[in-house]
From Swiss-Prot:
EC numbers, comma separated: 3.2.1.28
Residues bearing attached sugar chains per UniProt: 243, 275, 296, 362, 414, 428, 521, 572, 601, 661, 671, 729, 738, 912, 938, 993, 1011, 1033, 1052, 1070, 1097, 1165
The name this protein goes by in its record: Periplasmic/secreted acid trehalase ATH1
Organism: Candida glabrata (Yeast)
Membrane-spanning ranges: 83-103
Length: 1212
């Protein structure tokens, strides 16, 4: 068969492989001649295809040396225009043999792929023309419907709701003001947290978890009372002392900069004259006076809407608040006050209403009044404030109002105090004129926004122009605002069709990050500082931590690279101060402080020395990753003038900082703190030392690429820096770590991700053991950025199970707060039980981490580069290593992923991973790693000897290269992860806990094929139940099983099954259809009619487990329950097939582990059981639904928590 013929792999594998080999040879020769005559141009700079290749030529050069056959797309067709005869094929095969011999004997050519010349890269394309029909995802609606029960596991979801279709989050309960129940509006420049009534300023008056002194306070370092207030970006004050700080002695060396809040820009209030004057503001409205309440946040457009009836339902109040997405300094409030005519008393005649437009200094924090006044010409008010101790910075708040249908009749109003300014409007509501609508247009302009303009009068004029131009144009402004949000989402979208909660979390995370950042109107001399709490909170003083560099910016980079660049430009703008910091401590180079604000000086909250040195690696990583992404502007000039100075000066500093230990023959670090802040001032922090090693390699590669001077000492240190390890080859978090350690947050695991995603040194020799070991030692109340790291690490390291997805659920369920899908920093918000930690809120770090767990974790995408040995030039590429996602049937889709200035769709369905090149005019290079080199089994300590090298960028780590051209798609079969235990029919199936688990635990961990994750009952005195669904049309006869307990086995277990019935399958199929297509409350068909049932109207008691199953599969089955008792199907019961089976531990207590501080993985207690069906009544043995009941713990100790269920194994 000749090249002209279309050859399908599945029809003739031998011919396919022969032609693929010949095709590679031909293309390698073509590339060889091109490189000889045209020079070494990387694909990213090439404007045309290689000579001899056309759009009709599908050049397949999969790496036949190392790529597993199952990774080759069975749908790829090879088309050739040229008719080549058999002689040419044989000639090429002979040439291939000779060529291979040359490569294998020449050490220059056989170097690792991470540094191989493009001339000899296994480069080519396994692609096809892009097919839009293949870019959609499909998922079982029953699975998605079942996923909605996960919302019930979120904190405070009782009176919350989510409108999936319209992306609206909401609350139906009016209560006291508390931070976690409040939405906010923001546009990347201004923001305001919205109190219960929908506008205005409010101090918190309720803590949901504790009533104790300090319960209403925010956390370190301000420890002030939480409040719903307004903020403007980069408006930092200077504070000589703070309420709480780690290193107060450093206050003598320089003040700390923390964010100032500004006078509340949504502040409207009104009074009604009804048996006396009654005020409508957040301080005065009583809970008992409000009915029919709802407050909504639309993630589609960032508008907060509030609606309620007040004073016995007599008055309806509606409000809308939004920060204009394009006109960054403009905030708008719409207030509608109307009579409910049906609720008016018989004697009603009129209701006097007075509306106040107010700007109040008392609603700001850490500010000084500069000026306030009335602008009579424009019937407006304004106030100018300075942040504390910064007289050369100011912010103007300028407000003007209009009344719908009338002239602006607001008049000046004089308060008795000098720190407020107001105008008011009086009207009477009657049955003939029952409504008044007020529009408040507020402009906020700060010096930092207006080109660092220090003159307040200039900023006042700017603010006046914005507000008065906007006045009277509400509809057009609203349309423009919504369009701006629509355009943002048109650039970025994530789909998870099988799981409503995860998809909502992805979309809300994207919303929260976008709401607190902006693409333009950012000072090039300042950049964009983004605090942990964004623009609606002063958590952590609004200061900038590594959270911005490692967690937030990388999540935005694939969608909005210009925002990531703006954030990194803040570090560039403060780089000179980092140089001064190093000089202050007699070091060369530059060193950044742990916290930054208006300045980047060393402070009591943010030391530069003897603390978290990894911040310097984090900042360099963020900048280098922008270059790796290759967006517009992230070019060679960006690398030379932005990234290189940061990387170089960090390398110079670290060269001076490390100390050589002659006994070890390695370089060490001293008196530092790693990301795990439970362990302060330790030596040889693993993440810090690995970061130094990696950064020094970056410095060498970048400097050589740019032709800059490179210090050879950098690589000497990189090759010989000490990474502490135990005798069992587990990476120690720091030298001297003991076996009783509790880890605050992800630390050692960060060495895999994100530290490894820039280059090919992403697989640590002992990373798998590290992942297992440290997953058991995370603090139950640790911060919310921990488990997204485990998602990425598990996806890239483990070839068994589905724990990357169970970790994904652990990233959400303990931390996400209803009703407005905001992350808390902690899994436990009760400061009396979590170690006196008041959580940051909202915690944008978690939003960034969660997005990264999807963008880079589940997809296996990594930015990477290679260095050509001959030219020493860097060539950028994208690594793609997707695996099957059994817990997410239907897969995930990432729309409009930006890379090298091109636009991609990333699709992971049930069988294939697809990268579709749908925008741009340049090809991109993609590398698919070979997962067969991973070994995540047989990792007992005896198998590995202690090694000196820590990062395995060995010559054995190969992959396959593809070139993807515009309007083409790369399709590769997903890596099919293996079963953890052979024959386990329950692994990676759907599961739900019917009883409470320990906060932070998820039921998926018991079926994820990872023996080092677990689910644990909250109370060991109760019968804990887990309900397992073995899958649609998947029934089994369970004959035996195994339970892995870890170190805390149960006292006994029971196992029950629901005998299989085709009618039961039909029941759930029709319930799903009914819930998706009709509504019982709207007169839809009764369920028994849908099923064709004609049972007598006899009510029977429903088995509790049946009811739990129905609620799991139906979500809102409470609507259907009145119809269900008539059906005999619901009289079915779960049948016990194993009852009160006693548990006996089979592993001893390893006392020496504690006594001798031995760091190693311990074997798990296991229980094996068999099922004797001879003693079980009933004929049907097959089942789809299984309930595992776990009671007590084997040890009678004081710990109230139940047994740890690491893995459930069911076998036929």
């Amino acid at each position: 068969m000749g090249f002209k013929d279309k050859i399908l792999f599945w029809k003739d594998e031998v011919q396919y492989r022969t032609l693929a080999v010949a095709d590679q040879v031909a293309n390698r020769f073509l590339h060889s001649f091109e490189n000889v005559y045209q020079g070494d141009e990387s694909v990213e700079d090439a404007d045309s295809r290689p000579v001899g290749l056309t759009n009709e030529t599908l050049s397949h050069s999969s790496d036949f040396f190392v790529l597993p056959e199952e990774r080759i797309s069975t749908r790829v067709k090879i088309r050739r225009q040229n008719i080549l005869n058999t002689t040419l094929i044989l000639g090429m095969l002979i040439a291939l043999v000779i060529w291979t011999a040359i490569l294998s004997t020449n050490s220059y050519f056989s170097s690792s792929l991470a540094s191989a010349s493009p001339l000899f890269n296994k480069e080519g394309r396994v692609v096809r023309p892009m097919r839009e029909s293949n870019l959609g995802l499909h998922a079982d609606p029953q699975t998605r419907k079942s996923s909605k029960t996960l919302y019930d596991l979120l904190s405070d979801f009782d009176n919350a709701f989510y409108d999936d279709e319209n992306m609206i989050l909401g609350s139906l309960a009016f209560g006291e003001n508390t931070y976690s129940r409040q939405p906010y509006v923001a546009n990347g420049y201004i923001g305001s947290r919205i109190p219960n009534i929908g506008f205005g300023y409010a101090l918190d008056t309720l803590n949901l978890y504790a009533d104790a002194p300090g319960a209403l306070n925010n956390g370190w370092p301000l420890r002030n009372r939480r409040f719903a207030g307004s903020f403007v970006s980069d408006f930092y004050s200077l504070q000589a002392k703070l309420n709480s700080t780690n290193f107060p002695e450093l206050d003598e060396k320089g003040y700390t900069t923390v964010i100032s809040s500004i006078p509340e820009w949504t502040d409207l209030q009104f009074t009604v004259d009804l048996n006396g004057t009654k005020w409508f503001n957040p301080q005065s409205v009583l809970i008992d006076d409000v009915i029919n309440y709802n407050q909504n946040l639309s993630m589609k457009d960032g508008i907060v809407s509030t609606n309620m009836d007040w004073l016995n339902g007599m008055i309806n109040i509606k409000s809308e608040v939004w920060a204009h997405r394009k006109i960054h300094s403009l905030g708008i409030t719409r207030l509608e006050i109307s009579l409910n005519l049906d609720a008016l008393p018989d004697e009603f005649t009129e209701l006097p209403v007075t509306v106040y437009d107010i700007i109040d200094l008392n609603t700001s924090h850490r500010t000084t009044l500069y000026e306030k006044g009335q602008d009579e010409d424009n019937k407006a008010i304004y106030m100018i404030v300075n942040p504390d101790n910064v007289p050369y910075s100011n912010a103007v708040v300028y407000s003007t109002c209009t009344i719908k249908g009338t002239e602006n009749n607001f008049s000046p109003y004089n308060f008795t105090s000098d720190d407020r300014i107001a105008r008011n409007y009086m009207t009477n509501l009657t049955e003939e004129n029952p409504k008044v609508v007020i529009y408040k247009y507020t402009s906020v302009v700060s010096s930092e926004y207006n080109n660092d303009e220090p003159n307040p009068n200039v900023n006042l004029k700017f603010a006046s122009n914005i507000a008065n131009t906007a006045k009277g144009n509400y509809k057009s402004l609203l349309s423009n605002h919504k369009r701006a949000w629509y355009d943002l989402y048109n650039d970025a979208f994530i789909e998870i069709p099988s799981d409503s909660l995860l998809e909502m979390t992805a979309r809300s995370s994207l919303f929260h990050l976008l709401a607190n950042t902006r693409q333009y109107n950012v000072s090039t001399t300042r950049g964009l500082p983004v605090g942990v709490g964004g623009l609606s909170s002063d958590s952590y003083g609004g200061m900038v931590f590594w959270d911005a560099d490692v967690w937030m910016a990388p999540a935005l980079l694939p969608f909005f690279p210009n925002i990531a660049m703006n954030m990194n430009n803040y570090r560039n703008a403060t780089h000179q101060q980092a140089i001064e910091n190093a000089k202050q401590y007699n070091y060369p180079g530059a060193v950044y402080p742990w916290t930054s604000g208006r300045y980047a000086n060393c402070t009591s909250t943010g030391p530069c020395i003897d603390y978290e040195y990894h911040i310097n690696v984090d900042i360099a990583l963020a900048s280098f990753s922008i270059y790796m992404n290759g967006a517009e502007g992230a070019d060679e000039d960006y690398l030379r003038f932005t990234t290189w100075p940061m990387v170089k000066d960090a390398a110079v500093f670290f060269k001076a900082y490390v100390k050589y230990n002659e006994t070890l023959g390695e370089y060490e670090t001293y008196n530092l703190t790693d990301p795990d802040e439970f362990a302060n001032h330790v030596n040889n922090g693993a993440f810090t030392n690995a970061g130094i090693k990696t950064l020094l390699k970056w410095a060498t590669d970048i400097g050589t690429h740019l032709g800059e001077e490179v210090d050879p000492k950098w690589m000497e240190i990189a090759d010989n820096i000490h990474i502490p390890r135990s005798d069992s080859n587990i990476t120690l978090e720091y030298s001297g770590m003991n076996s009783s350690v509790e880890i605050k947050q992800a630390d050692v695991t960060l060495m895999v991700y994100p530290l490894g995603y820039i280059n090919d040194e992403s697989i640590l020799n002992n990373a798998i053991k590290d992942l297992y070991y440290y997953s058991e030692r995370q603090s139950a109340s640790g911060p919310a950025m921990t488990y997204p790291v485990f998602v990425a690490a598990a996806a890239s390291l483990l070839n068994h199970g589905s724990s990357s997805q169970s970790y994904l659920y652990k990233s959400v369920l303990p931390y996400l707060r209803s009703p407005f899908a905001q992350f808390s920093e902690q899994s436990d918000d009760n400061f009396l039980t979590n170690g006196l930690t008041q959580p940051a809120f909202p915690f944008l770090t978690a939003n960034g981490g969660f997005l990264q767990s999807i963008l880079f974790g589940l997809t296996g995408l990594r930015y990477s580069y290679e260095v050509t040995p001959r030219t020493k030039k860097i060539s950028r590429l994208l690594k793609f290593d997707p695996v099957k996602l059994p817990l997410l049937p239907g897969g995930i889709a990432i729309r409009n992923f930006k890379y090298m200035g091109q636009v991609l769709d990333i699709i992971i369905d049930d069988n294939n991973g697809t990268i579709a090149h749908k925008g741009g005019d340049k090809p991109i290079r993609i590398k698919v790693p070979n997962r067969d080199i991973l070994h995540d089994r047989n990792i007992t300590s005896a198998l590995y000897s202690k090694r000196d090298d820590d990062l395995s960028a060995t010559d054995d780590y190969y992959g396959t290269y593809f070139t993807l051209y515009p309007n083409e798609e790369l399709v590769i079969p997903l890596y099919d992860t293996k079963l953890n235990i052979d024959g386990n029919i329950a692994e990676s199936k759907q599961i739900t806990n019917l009883t409470a688990g320990v906060p932070g635990d998820v039921g998926f961990s018991a079926l994820d094929g990872n023996n080092y994750t677990h689910w644990q009952p909250f109370d060991k005195s109760d019968n804990a139940k887990l309900l397992i669904d073995l899958g649609f049309n998947s029934t089994h006869v369970i004959k035996k099983g195994i339970i892995l307990w870890g170190q805390r086995p149960a006292k006994n277990i029971s196992l029950s099954v629901l005998p299989h019935s085709e009618r039961i399958e039909q029941l759930f199929a029709n319930i799903t259809d009914l819930l998706e297509t009709s509504s019982i409350t709207k007169g839809g068909l009764p369920l028994n009619q849908m099923l064709g049932q004609t049972q007598s109207n006899v009510t029977a008691e429903i088995d509790d487990d049946i009811l739990a199953l129905l609620n799991w599969k139906g979500d809102d089955l409470d609507q259907l329950i009145p119809y269900l008792p008539d059906m005999h199907l619901l009289q079915e019961k779960f049948i016990p097939i194993l009852k009160d089976y006693p548990i006996k531990p089979n592993q001893r207590y390893y006392e020496e582990i504690i006594d001798d501080d031995i760091i190693k993985l311990l074997p798990s207690n296991t229980t094996e059981f068999t099922i004797d069906y001879n003693s079980i009544p009933g004929g049907e043995k097959r089942a789809r639904y299984v309930v595992l009941t776990v009671h007590g713990t084997y040890d009678d100790d004081d710990d109230l928590k139940g047994a740890t269920i690491r893995e459930i194994v069911l076998q036929e």
